[in-house]
């Protein structure tokens, strides 16, 4: 077992916050407070009139946020898909100058064996971002069919051995009274089911990702947040999103591309470009940003991060 504990280092900290083009008197949302790296930097750029609202599903993130003694700051224990509801309750719909989302699982969540996210540390097989709601991974695996599990592994983990792994997991649970309940127990069953090992990647990597995404409805949450962002943002409001795997990044990229594209109009028609742009809700800001080699060296977990920024017209 790997006992190395990674200090939590906020990925693309300055790039993501710079992407918000902070207005000192603006109103901002950090949809994924985590351990507060982005939030604290945003607060440092705001005037006394500025405001920051943060959300997070993780009770431990909420506890960390409650240590911030700042009248400009407010934390709400909810998923970032509920940002429109939060804004409505606060009378801020259409008044938000920027939203930052840092997707995926954080280092403290991975490193805390009790959370059940890591296949490198033995702990209860939980995987819930919000430990107060829903089924744990162990509870779900105890009742899922092999077909449904294979679908989850294939869809959310792009796992090539999805059927083989699913069959092994479900068969094991059917054959014993004490179902799979520990992270390393599941990791070993997966490893035994995979015929070819990738020397650069643990055989349980994709399966753990897939189960975590499913348990937390991560892609549904992201889809809801993206679809509601335009109604929440003020004109010229920024969207700054960090993703860590191709499924998330694909969704963010397609959303920004779709909403920044004008109509295809035949050449020669007497229509001004400004008229065409009236109905285009977003403008993409720059190219996708990846971590520098220096950041990757300092924090290897940042390697797969991709930051995309867009602005509401």
Curated annotation (Swiss-Prot):
It is an enzyme of class 2 (transferase). GO terms for cellular component: cytoplasm. The keyword Methyltransferase applies. It catalyses: cytidine(1402) in 16S rRNA + S-adenosyl-L-methionine = N(4)-methylcytidine(1402) in 16S rRNA + S-adenosyl-L-homocysteine + H(+). S-adenosyl-L-methionine binds at residues 36-38, 56, 80, 102, 109. Keywords: Cytoplasm, Methyltransferase, rRNA processing, S-adenosyl-L-methionine, Transferase. Its EC number is 2.1.1.199. Disulfide bonds: none annotated. GO terms for biological process: rRNA base methylation. It is found in: Cytoplasm. One of its GO terms (molecular function) is rRNA (cytosine-N4-)-methyltransferase activity. Pfam families: Methyltransf_5. InterPro entries: RsmH (IPR002903), SAM-dep_MeTrfase_MraW_recog (IPR023397), SAM-dependent_MTases_sf (IPR029063). The keyword Nucleus does not apply. Belongs to the methyltransferase superfamily. RsmH family. Specifically methylates the N4 position of cytidine in position 1402 (C1402) of 16S rRNA. HAMAP family: 16SrRNA_methyltr_H. This is Ribosomal RNA small subunit methyltransferase H. It comes from Actinobacillus pleuropneumoniae serotype 3 (strain JL03). The gene is rsmH.
């Amino acid at each position: 077992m790997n006992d190395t504990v990674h200090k939590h280092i906020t990925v693309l900290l300055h790039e993501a916050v710079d992407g918000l083009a902070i207005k000192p008197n603006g109103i901002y949302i950090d949809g994924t407070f985590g351990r507060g790296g982005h939030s604290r930097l945003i607060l440092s750029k705001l005037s006394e009139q500025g405001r920051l609202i943060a959300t997070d599903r993780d009770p431990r993130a909420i506890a960390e946020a409650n240590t911030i003694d700042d009248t400009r700051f407010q934390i709400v224990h909810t998923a970032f898909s509920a940002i429109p509801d939060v804004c409505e309750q606060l009378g801020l719909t259409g008044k938000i100058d920027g939203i930052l989302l840092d997707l995926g699982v954080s280092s403290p969540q991975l490193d805390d064996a009790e959370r059940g996210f890591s296949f490198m540390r033995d702990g209860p097989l939980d995987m819930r971002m919000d430990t107060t709601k829903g089924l744990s991974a162990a509870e779900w695996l105890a009742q899922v069919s092999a077909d449904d599990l294979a679908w989850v592994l294939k869809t959310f983990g792009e796992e090539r051995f999805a059927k083989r792994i699913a069959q092994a997991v479900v068969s094991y649970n059917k054959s014993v009274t004490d179902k799979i309940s520990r992270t390393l127990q599941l990791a070993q069953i997966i490893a035994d089911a995979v015929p070819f090992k990738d020397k650069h990647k643990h055989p349980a990597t994709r399966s753990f990702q897939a189960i975590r995404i499913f348990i937390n409805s991560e892609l549904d949450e992201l889809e809801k947040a993206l679809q509601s962002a335009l109604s929440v943002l003020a004109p010229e409001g920024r969207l700054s999103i960090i993703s860590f795997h191709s499924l998330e990044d694909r969704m963010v990229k397609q959303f920004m591309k779709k909403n920044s594209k004008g109509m295809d109009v035949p050449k020669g028609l007497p229509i001004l470009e400004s008229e065409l742009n009236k109905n285009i809700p977003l403008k993409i800001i720059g190219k996708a940003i990846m971590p520098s080699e220096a950041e990757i060296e300092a924090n290897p977990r940042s390697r797969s991060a991709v930051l995309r920024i867009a602005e509401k017209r």
